[in-house]
């Protein structure tokens, strides 16, 4: 047993230059843990509350001093004296201390920072890497990476409607080789875009952010890059999309407006038709948030039409919330959940969502946020839970590469027992 003797939070910066919360946990044994909380750009309306100060004279209103003070003045006195290995007890105490259904009093960014830092300190105390401490000796599966190599939507200053176009190197024999394949396609894509006279600047998540004629064109240039890198789309490498359709859903009309393509007023059924057409023309294996988060009828139609052959991931739809996920499972909506630790606010609740998904035959994709840091906790979470898939950006920007590098270290440490399932990690669909 090692008792927590101090908890300290400070304001630091994320990859977009916005403030976020860093927390340190100290124990009587000398064990120590530190964690930094990520932040999203396109957020689901049902997510746990990220507490911002709102003082326009400081960081344009995005400061997190109140969240930091909540850790130092309210949460710290509550959990000092806890055994650092009592993760569930500490998380439960913070949830009760907040007392709201969405962590709106103390802030999910305050609570999550403590939750993650406690886990790091506990792992340090028992002398285990974080993934092994959290997952035990069964933690050995490296996740298939979903690499966002073209950024659009709210993640880039361009005219592309869909938020992310991803490559999935499912044909690699190891995680290390999947990273090599992804990097080679990334560099090939840069050359393809350059040769077409297109912008090769990158967006929030490290992917390229060119202006393109359509969402279809984004898929076409990625196919060209895959072939240029010496791989075959639909065999070595598949495609994925995070549509983030809530960002272009018109609440007044109840329709979808693809402004970049000049197509407005699309119904849910027309959006589903569009996805079906794209899936026939391209080797798309995963679609995230294809309809608005509140368009459950649309999601049901999408699942009926594509759910047997395409992974349909609920991000804004489920917001890492077991109540939302349970409703989706009951109604037969989607077949996968995106896991973002700051959508729910504690590690305990995060693990509960992953476990619920697996029991229902849904996949779980551990994910970063667009506002990231050098913190690589989600890499360990992906292995600890044998989630099978991770979405943590492109092959550029240190805030993204930090997670890939941590996974490379973990694979190296696991040695011969490391598992990379590739295409088999998509157990929710038929290929």
From Swiss-Prot:
Gene Ontology CC entries for this record: cell surface; extracellular region; phosphopyruvate hydratase complex
Cofactor note: Binds a second Mg(2+) ion via substrate during catalysis.
Subcellular location, record wording: Cytoplasm; Secreted; Cell surface
Gene3D superfamilies linked: Enolase-like C-terminal domain, Enolase-like, N-terminal domain
SMART domains registered for this protein in UniProt: Enolase_C (SM01192), Enolase_N (SM01193)
CDD domains with a match to the protein in the record: enolase (cd03313)
Swiss-Prot/TrEMBL catalytic activity: (2R)-2-phosphoglycerate = phosphoenolpyruvate + H2O
Pathway(s) this gene product operates in, as recorded in its UniProt entry: Carbohydrate degradation; glycolysis; pyruvate from D-glyceraldehyde 3-phosphate: step 4/5
EC number: 4.2.1.11
Active site annotation, chain numbering: 205 (proton donor), 340 (proton acceptor)
Molecular function as annotated in GO: magnesium ion binding; phosphopyruvate hydratase activity
Cross-referenced InterPro entries: Enolase, Enolase-like_C_sf, Enolase-like_N, Enolase_C, Enolase_CS, Enolase_N
GO biological process, one term: glycolytic process
Entries under Pfam families matching the protein: Enolase_C, Enolase_N
Cofactors, names only: Mg(2+)
Major place of residence: cytoplasm
Protein name from the UniProt record: Enolase
Organism placement in taxonomy: Bacteria, Bacillati, Bacillota, Bacilli, Bacillales
